[in-house]
Amino acid sequence: MGNKVIALVIGVILLTGRAGWCDDKLNIAVSHPWLVLLVSFIGGTEVNVIPVRVWNANGDVVVADRGRVLRELEEGTKAVALDEDDAKEAGLMGTRKNFAVRCLYSPFPLSINALPDPSVMPFVAQRVLTALSEWDAMNYPNYQRRLAEFQARMSSSVLVGQVLKDSTVCDMSGASGVMLQAAGCRVIRPEELERWEKGNFAGLREYLDNNRNQEITTMIDDDTPAVLKRYLSGRSDIYKWERPPLDRDYPTFLQEQYISLWQKIVTKPLPGMNRKR
């Protein structure tokens, strides 16, 4: 009886090519933090994601662990990149090691800053599904289910963001304005922003004080130039749109950001908290 069970187990492994109960996950190196979030969600428990690049404390994209992760990748490791340029920037193409890189686009038709756009992410997620399914056809139903869940939850998060509809927000972010548009905010972008981003702050204090008097919240993010972020630090009427941690569920994180911004807008700052040099 025991020999028959062993033979059956071996037969199943040979037929499927993978022993799911042996924690045989699909190892995939990923080129960019935004893609890490997508591959992690769509892959679920079937995929072990290896981030080649991450966000540092300032929100900049940097090589993970000072390049150690990339150096330790084995020849032939499966990898996902947005396009060839993204793969080369991540060190997954054009190096001495040959990785099995799957580029999702040729090339990606938008700026990399468009990736977090709620109207863009679900389409990129579909390409992630295709890549994972080519490597692991057996788990296609799982990946398809996760894609459907991702699309539904992103839509749900944007619906939560509708609490901000018609709220006026001054956008001084580098790449997060699309989140405001998706939520139906009235977005204003100052004409002098390019000059302020270069450190010429003439008129900025008066502009911010005027916004504050009109109860208009100003939003920045990690892509806002550092010189401008430093100037704005400490003001209670500034909201910073954060980068998601790579181990977070992105639709939930997006929903939390919308709620946090709404709380910022409806909470009036205490008198005297916006004094600035």
Question: PLM features: residue spans?
Answer:
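Bacterial N-terminal signal peptides
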Residues: K4-G17
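Extracytoplasmic metal-acquisition and chelation regions
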Residues: C22-R277
